[in-house]
């Protein structure tokens, strides 16, 4: 049996719940956003969607441990566009493009050095092609292929200039079959395949090669229902360019 009282080296583990927690950094973030989107009918079978989001992202990170503080403000416009073609009433073919960005303070907004504070945010460009097919009144199928690429700024210590490099690249496919089995039971089966590549050509972290999912929803009556879902993921790597598997 597993013994949680000791670690892998056989040393007793303990947690002190009486000491005060010590923060390594504190972040102050202010975000102001404006989002606009419109869909227009070009013909009876063709629709176009245009939109965008304007963000003002202001962040200050205080490094309590080292006694430093860095700030940065990013004002960026992220466009998005889509084209929908309906060859028949129950089938839609679509293509979309969108951009998003992530400040250089990272996903948790907890690290901002003097170098990263002078760099532009990471920009993510995503394109997608897909189909949505209402096979019957109670059965639908969707499929898509997509590609997402990260562009990030880097600082050259020798020249003192910024430049852009290609970062994370992810492409893949997604499939889903959704059906109303009975008046009360709905099922959805999904599958996705992803491939992630780092800027150096290695394998990206936490990108599962295959994912299967099954979700069920049962409506007992108009006031009560339950749902159950199962997801199975294939192999993914612990960190970028690593051979270690989760």
Region locations from a protein language model:
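Glycine-rich, charged/polar anion/phosphate-binding loops
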Residues: 1, 127-129, 213
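Outer-membrane beta-barrel translocator domains and adjoining extracellular loop/strand segments
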Residues: 1-3, 60-67, 105-114, 152-161, ...
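Short C-terminal domain-edge/linker segments immediately following a structured domain
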Residues: 7-20, 124-128, 172, 176, ...
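Structural signature of Gram-negative outer-membrane beta-barrels, strongest in the C-terminal barrel
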Residues: 25-150, 180-182, 190-195, 217-223
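Gram-negative outer-membrane beta-barrel transporters
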Residues: 43-44, 140, 145-149, 164-241
